[in-house]
Every structure is written in C-alpha cells, then in structure tokens.
Amino acid sequence: MTAKPIIVVAIGGNGICPSAVGAEMSFTAQLIHTKRTLWNLISLLDHYQVVITHGNGPQAGLVYEQMIPRTPFGVVTLVTTSQISSAITRAYEELIIENNLQGLPPLEPVLSWVRVDPHDPGFANPSKPVGQQLSSDQVAELLRYHPEYLFTDYGQGKRRLIASPRPKKVLNIADILEVIEDGKVPVALGGGGIPVFLDNHGRKEIANGILDKDLSSALLAGDLAADDFLILTNEQGVFTGYGTPSMLFHPQIESSQVQRWLSEGEFPPGSMGPKAEAALQFLAANPRGRVIVGHVEEHAEKLLDGSAGTTITAG
C-alpha cells in the first residue's frame, strides 16, 4: 500500500457537467467543466494518494432516453462511466500540458462492480434524481409518453427519480488496489459503480437501478482504510433548516449530531441524506478519519484546512 495518506474524492455529476435547465451537455462542455473541477484538486497529489470517484446524474437521464426500452438502468452506468472517465482523464492530461506540470501520476479508470440486494426496498421506491433539470413543459411532454415516470423538485426545475438500492460491496477492490500499487490515481465507482446481483455461481446480473456515488464511495474509503473522504457537491457544506429563514451553516460537526439530524429528517433523500449516511458509514469504519463536504468549485486546500466546507469527525 502507498506510504502517503489516502483520500477518496467523490465528485458529484455536476462537477463534470452542470445539471441546470438548458445546460450544454456536449463532450467539449463536459471537458471544460471537468478541468475547472480538477484544477482545484491538483494540489492534493503532493500530499495524498488520491482516489477519484464520480457521479453520473446529469448524464444518466439523457443516455437512458436514447437506449432500448426496458434496458436495466445499471447499463446506463456502464455506458456513462466510459464517457465520464474519458472526460476526466482527458481534462487531467490537458491541465498538465497547459500548465507545464511535472511529475504528476497518471489517471487510470477502473470499471467498478458493486453488489446489491435484489430485495432492497429502494427498487420499489425510486429516490435518486437523474438527468438535467427539466422545465414544467419538458416534464409534461415526457409524461405523455411515459406516465410511469416519477419526478422531484430540484433547483429551478424537476429531475426524474430512479430506483437506488443500497450498495453492499465493491466487488473488484483488488483492481483499484493494483492501480494504487502502480503509482497511479484510480478513477473508480463511476456513477456509484455498476449495480449487480450475484447468483449462486457468482455470475453478475446488472440491476435496474442506479447507485448513490457517496454511499458507494464510503464503502470504498472504508475498504482502503482512507484517512480522509472528500464529498464535493453544489452546496458550501452542511446546513440545517435548508431553504428556511432559520437556515444555518455548520463548519464543524460530529457524527452523533449528524445521526440525530438525519433521524429527525433534516437531510432529505436524494439530496444531503445519502451524503450524511455516507459520512456516518465511513466514520464507523475509520473513527480517526475525516469527512469533508464542500462545494465542487472550492479549492481543496481550503476544504482540508477547515477554512471552507464542513468537516465531520467521529464523536
């Protein structure tokens, strides 16, 4: 294992491509957006063995609409993982060339398989927002052809909800460890990983759902005995009373407080809820670790020194 401390950096799908209504989704647009995100993370490579994970929410909905009907949604993750990891790798290489950066380790994408329970209640209760934010007219048009679709309010529009079972185990952790041993930066768990069922013979069947990348990343961070777990999102950090006059930002909190707020319904599913659960899961596996939640456009150094974002520790 590497001599450097390990940090798992979970980049939200919006760190690759914005989900705002009407946002451009071309590969070039994603490349530009990704370069901005990675630039804020470059300095981590001086001090950490970095492991990158990423979401696919904005991209997944668009890809699904172009696929054969009744295709398992896990196949969408398989497709988008290739596209997004290519954008991340290309953006990283361009940053190195454009800024004449020397001695940085290469990135290596790792296709990641994650076991889920076929009886998980998440299959019956879709909760994961995917795709871009849609206007009311766009939602109405989709419902004409797909009355079974479910949507949720998100920002200034709506996003579609997809079944999201809980990740149980990262199946190919050895592949990620091999990349680390080779001195490279793994880009793993794209879209939370490809959700699969295992039959009695260990054969994989792709599930009709999408995983939460933060919950999957927490599993990985625990397996790797990571020191820090950085969750990049569209918010400055953790808030209570979100969207109300009593909204309050919390720069430092302990896991017991997160657990209490979570049980009180402070963090809704499909938003901060899974991030809070992921933080608790990682800190249970590594009580000496830290979880940092911060804005995807913030510089990583500020998030790690506590001058920005929210730092969560066990206690």
Question: What do these predicted regions represent?
Answer:
Residues 2-315:
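C-terminal catalytic "cap/lid" subdomain
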